Amino acid sequence: MPDATTDSNKPTTTTGARMASDQAGRLMRLATYASVTVAVVLIVTKFVAWLMTDAVSLLSTLIDSFLDAGASLLNLLAVRQALEPPDKEHRFGHGKAEPLAGLAQAAFICGSAVFLVIEAGERLFNPRTIENTAIGYAVMVLAIVLTLFLLAFQRYVVGKTGSIAITADSAHYQMDVLVNISVIVSLALVSTLGWTWADPVLALAIAVYIVWGAW
């Protein structure tokens, strides 16, 4: 029979390795707030960059940031629920909310991926020149820097709390660093070599990554 102290989805306390439960809870909440904030900032900046560059690869990473924001918001709600004290309906706490959030994240994916494939396919057969590439470079560098700072903080929080939700949130942000770097490469190929096909091809690759990440 499980008890409240053995729920693997609650912040755990191990001698010399885990923080006190209230301190761990505060760290977990702070990590979820940080991830949602970063995602929202990136959505705004990438949206502006997409409008100014008309690059479908930027559209793809914008969609990815929308998915990140949704997943991070789910994790925020799950962590808050998991940290609630036991009640009559939840005798052993609310810790099972964290794994459920991981399952719910997959619901964000398919429609966005289909939309991106359609947009990238149209651009592949009707290539366009990318404008204001300097804006695209600047936004992608900003995205990489913010994501790296977020990942460092999440790694610290996971080390202190062992949170399942924060671990899952960190996993897709790790891949986002590579995605953002690939967008920079795509912009460079289009602007310097005139390889207009590189933009939609990368967008299609990101669409595949988005679907793969859901499973």
Each model region followed by its residue ranges:
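Alpha-helical transmembrane segments and adjacent TM-loop junctions that form the membrane-embedded core
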Residues: 2-40, 45, 52-215
